[in-house]
């Protein structure tokens, strides 16, 4: 879950393949439509008795449509550039009239807003996270389901279905396989239930990142320094400290037990404020913004 959450937060999906040359399993990571495997086309033929003419086919096709958000707005605060405008707004559909509403997300933890007009915004910028979120919403706009007898079907493939009026345009133009369930037994033929989304040039598959761990309350720690018995506070230019979490049993180089951690202060501004430096050994309580373990601060 930890790996899939981190990858899902930045829109990366993966699949397992086999290297026939080295006879090993391989994990492939992708973040765009370039990772799709294309070229699989199957006919729409419902099963009839025990005779399939030795041809793999697709049947039981369904499409479900939902109204999703028209655009995504994000905002964050970067104390390093406190006056910078961190608002971004992205519409990945390029004007789809069937979408509606604005999804607003606060504190995706980015440092720069990025360009909302760039289809490939700077990684981990506000526009980047807004586009990832909107593409994830668009993944739920059209959901495709079906059953096939093809044993080589795998997630990440683009399946096209040929046939008559029973084949919806979504299947005729191509469906990206996002999930599948394979089953077979003695009294029933081999079959694969699959889920998918339309193969679109406007957006790609974006996995759900899953729930993030929540750090409730505070944790005890002590301020550290690279100098033993330091008489001054060991801080950086932004007034941040390094701390030693008291629950941590690993051994670290003195003064490098953590990344720089910001201290919350009762009075602070652009060019004014009050900061009483903490000396090495001072006990502090570590809190977490919105319970996010990636955003600790000295309470």
Regions found by a protein language model. Name each.
Residues 1-299:
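Amphipathic alpha-helical and helix-coil boundary elements used as assembly
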